[in-house]
Amino acid sequence: GLELSTPLRVGLGYDSHRFESDRPLILGGITIPDHPGLAGHSDGDAITHALIDAILGAASLGNVGTHFPPTEEKWKDADSTELLSNSVAVIDREGWMVVNVDVTVICESPQISLFAEEMKERLSGVLQVPVERISIKGKTNEGLGWIGESKGLAVHAVALLESR
């Protein structure tokens, strides 16, 4: 069986935000044109927020709120890819590296498949992993609930870390 000192860890992240018409939509570090943005203290990038939680969680090092509290003014309108980069540095200092990530965005619009490759390219450098180790896909909520009513979106992310 696996020993407690196994060099692999898995983390699960989640984030959701409501749409807000007076902001740009930023997902996966890119701006999605012609779509309402996401409410949030930082830039509202739910993909990067879910990835931060997955990565920090896998290393047992907290979450987006403990490292970048919404009560602190310095994180207001922050670029979430910078927060993700900071989180990768945190796990690196503790001897961990990202092996791969898998992201599912749940929304009626935008159509995630149209932007997934650009998101993967953007996040590859931030996560310090090859593009082929990043999966980003979209699912609808089939018109059900607040997501189905296009009031916002939700993101699930899984990260695999390896001890260096």
Predicted regions and their residues:
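RNase III-family endoribonuclease catalytic core
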Residues: L2-E117, V126-L127
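Generic detector of short, aliphatic-rich beta-strand segments that form the cores of beta-sheets
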Residues: G1-L2, A157
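C-terminal binding/interaction regions
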Residues: Q111-S113, K120-E121, V126-G148, G152-R164
